Amino acid sequence: RGNIAPMLELGSGFDFDMTGRENIFLNGAILGYSKEFLESKYDEIVAFSEIGQFIDVPLRNYSSGMIARLAFSVATVVVPEILIVDEVLSVGDADFQEKSRKRMMELMGGGTTVLFVSHNIKQVEEMCNHVVWLEHGQVQMFGDTQTVCDAYAG
């Protein structure tokens, strides 16, 4: 149990005809945040996402990296008890990927459970202390990171 911040599919919870500003409030509401809370965190969300000059542009004009940055910024504006991220570190430029990785590590250090989905074995080794290896929807192995990653690579 806990408040969950999911980032499962790029653009889910967004309206591509609305601006970035409007989508902060839409996506935040979907995640259960009040308008007042989002107003108090608005500047932080925009600053972390690094899309300030495009905040009043409709999302249909955003790159996939910009959408991912906005989604990640909204999802992590509070410390969720559970954060679900699907390939978030593979979208956007290298600087934002590193910034996102650091934010996830901070959240994990603060007690957030992160369910991290990735095909990048190096990211899995760096981010995880337990791993579930799934193949075609079936659990192949569950255990400590190095054991599972070694089996997967072997």
Question: Where do the model's predicted regions map?
Answer:
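ABC ATPase nucleotide-binding domain signature region
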Residues: 1-28
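A short, surface-exposed alpha-helical micro-motif characterized by mixed small hydrophobic
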Residues: 124-126
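Helical segment within the ABC ATPase nucleotide-binding domain
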Residues: 97-110
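A short, proline-enriched helix->beta-strand linker immediately N-terminal to the Walker B motif
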Residues: 76-85
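H-loop/switch region of ABC-family ATPase nucleotide-binding domains
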Residues: 118-119
